[in-house]
């Protein structure tokens, strides 16, 4: 149930100028939007309960680095994406995570390295859990945007080859 969940409900959003997407990400907004529409339809036809490309990757990385309970990745990574082309041709993209289970004190957050990571993010003070949730959501947004752009630009496999992952 994505309406009555535990944890934090968080949304991250961005509007990327068409020029930036084309020059930096090698992917025009229209092409990424079209891919997103295909992906959404595929998820719907497969009976998926979410439509993110890989929320779990960013969430897992942040959870391990910042002392979160990694067992909560499964529940936390069920989320939604939304995209549109703005009237001036820019790309609007958002991610919604309805049940992000995070904390900034207790448990693994007290481990030295994990606490240092939270400190670097400015999330060790009491009451900073909402800020941390926003940072995690921004990480997810960037990951999904990067993956989608790399696939559309036909650079996903070549980047893995270049960086040695497929050796």
Locate predicted features.
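Glycine-rich anion/phosphate-binding loop at the beta-strand->alpha-helix junction
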Residues: 1-109
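Internal helix-turn-beta structural module
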Residues: 92-167
């Amino acid at each position: 149930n994505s309406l009555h969940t535990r944890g934090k409900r968080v949304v991250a959003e961005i509007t990327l100028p068409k020029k930036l997407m084309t020059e930096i990400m090698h992917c025009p907004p229209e092409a990424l939007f079209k891919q997103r529409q295909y992906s959404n339809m595929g998820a719907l036809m497969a009976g998926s309960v979410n439509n993110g490309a890989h929320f779990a990757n960013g969430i897992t990385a942040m959870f391990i680095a910042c002392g979160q309970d990694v067992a909560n990745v499964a529940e936390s990574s069920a989320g939604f994406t939304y995209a549109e082309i703005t009237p001036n041709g820019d790309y609007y993209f958002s991610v919604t995570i309805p049940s992000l289970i995070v904390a900034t004190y207790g448990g693994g957050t007290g481990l030295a390295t994990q606490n240092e990571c939270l400190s670097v993010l400015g999330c060790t003070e009491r009451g900073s859990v909402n800020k941390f949730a926003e940072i995690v959501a921004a990480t997810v947004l960037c990951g999904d945007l990067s993956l989608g752009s790399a696939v559309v630009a036909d650079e996903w496999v070549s980047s893995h080859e270049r960086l040695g992952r497929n050796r």
